[in-house]
């Protein structure tokens, strides 16, 4: 099964969009950590919501008729890896929902809650980075390395 140019373009666009939003989110997070003001909190929340929405669309693209199905169609033996990545999607969504609830309140006045949020946010970004790396490695292996060499 060939990977269409449309699918490749969409994969590239999805990942580029997430990368740009993640960089902006990390910048806003750093600014908020430097100065816990209501203005910086609002700025961070706005970008967090954009990142969360984009990530949700990205996960849906992968899961529902997106390229993870093509991974399985092409290489069914990768089912365990795909299942793990999809399980991580659910787990990341749970953390995003929890952090969004935290952000709905002003964290600037509650130092212990703010510190807990910071730790949880850093953990999320680390986990997301590892998830994306595992996903890229799988996609490269299936669509480009295996497809270009062993088909």
Regions from the language model: what does each represent?
Residues 1-151:
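Small-residue-biased structural context
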């Amino acid at each position: 099964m060939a990977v269409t140019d449309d699918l490749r373009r969409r994969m590239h666009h999805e990942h580029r969009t997430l990368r740009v939003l993640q960089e902006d989110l990390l910048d806003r997070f750093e600014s908020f950590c430097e100065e816990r003001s209501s203005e910086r909190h609002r700025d961070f929340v706005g970008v967090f919501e954009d990142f969360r929405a984009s990530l949700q669309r990205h996960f849906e693209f992968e899961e529902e008729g997106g390229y993870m199905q093509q991974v399985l169609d092409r290489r069914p033996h990768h089912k365990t890896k795909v299942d793990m990545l999809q399980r991580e999607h659910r787990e990341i969504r749970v953390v995003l929902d929890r952090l969004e609830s935290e952000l709905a309140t002003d964290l600037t006045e509650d130092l212990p809650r703010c510190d807990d949020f910071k730790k949880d946010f850093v953990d999320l970004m680390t986990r997301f980075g590892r998830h994306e790396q595992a996903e890229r490695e799988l996609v490269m292996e299936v669509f480009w390395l295996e497809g270009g060499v062993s088909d």
